[in-house]
Amino acid sequence: LTRAATEDELLVAARRHRDWMLWGGTTTLEAKSGYGLDRDTELKMLRVIRRLNEEGPVRIVPTLLAAHTVPPEYKDRRGEYVRWVAEELIPEVAAEGLVQYCDAFCDDHAFTVEETRTVLSAAKRHGLKLRVHADQFRPGTGADLAAELGAATADHLETATDETLERLRAAGVQPVVLPGSVFALTPETGSVHEIA
């Protein structure tokens, strides 16, 4: 649906969601790409986020999440997709000033630690702040990388160990718990209660 929608159609839908959140008291939110996973759709989504941000009254923090999942057309060419994100997409969105952050989903079902390192290292070189979807389904899938790279946040962390949480604290990485994901996707909340 996102790939087929026009920029104006996405803007209308985004306004609806923004207005609903504003009605609930939200004054600042993060909006991520990552549902198009090709150049045109990622740029379209980020330009919609910029337009919505310019309208106000809600402050929107734009984040590139092209490393959310490997798109079907790259199923057998993962490395090519990772290189494209790191070497082409990130420089383009950074040069256009479309994002403040770059996020990557580091997990068995998404991107490996090395693939995530490639994407986030490129983002860091281009002046973007970092976020990592980390240790959501299995420990050791991204939180240590978040600490190593000095990410702003490590998100999810349902399976993070106490040692990993301590490394995040020592590195100044803010852990972010996403309760909706926790309760919708995982029967065990692991270390989430201790983080909160």
Language model segments and positions:
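Alpha-helix termination/capping residues and helix-transition junctions
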Residues: 23, 95-99, 148-151, 170
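Metal-coordinating catalytic core of metallo-dependent amide/deamination hydrolases
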Residues: 1-15, 19-20, 27-140
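Active-site-adjacent C-terminal substructures of enzyme catalytic domains
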Residues: 129-130, 139-196
